[in-house]
């Protein structure tokens, strides 16, 4: 199925100046937030191979990955807030923490405008997602 076959669009925006491992880490963490918030409707059934071994289910729809500068990530966060589109976020400070409560403390320590964003993910209706993501280019 294509992105347009779904009522919603799922997207990750990652900062372009990150190391490869950081980009992957950010994508993994922020998409977990989208999946948790979306609930069972966004997750498919278990995978089963030809030998009957079971594997965990995945999201049922494609995930679009975009690249952006730090300033553009701030713009994306602001647009999402204005349109009341829930987002998952990852900040640079979170690279130096080791657990969830420390991650939340890192985010709580900064005003929204001062967050050093390195990644954002969202799942929203196409129209809202397109408005929030306007002007971004797909990750190479």
Question: Can you annotate each of these PLM segments?
Answer:
Residues 1-140:
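Positively charged, small/polar-rich N-terminal and surface patches that mediate targeting and assembly
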């Amino acid at each position: 199925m294509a992105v347009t076959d779904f009522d919603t669009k799922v997207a990750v925006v990652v900062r372009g100046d990150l190391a490869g491992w950081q980009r992957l880490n950010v994508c993994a963490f922020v998409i977990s937030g989208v999946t948790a918030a979306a609930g069972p409707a966004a997750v498919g059934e278990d995978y089963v191979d030809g030998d009957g071994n079971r594997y965990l289910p995945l999201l049922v729809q494609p995930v679009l990955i975009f690249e952006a500068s730090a300033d553009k990530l701030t713009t994306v966060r602001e647009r999402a807030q204005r349109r009341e589109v829930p987002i998952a976020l990852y900040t640079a400070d979170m690279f130096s923490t080791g657990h969830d409560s420390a991650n939340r403390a890192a985010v709580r320590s900064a005003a929204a405008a001062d967050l050093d964003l390195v990644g954002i993910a969202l799942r929203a209706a196409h129209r809202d997602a397109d408005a929030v993501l306007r002007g971004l280019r797909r990750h190479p």
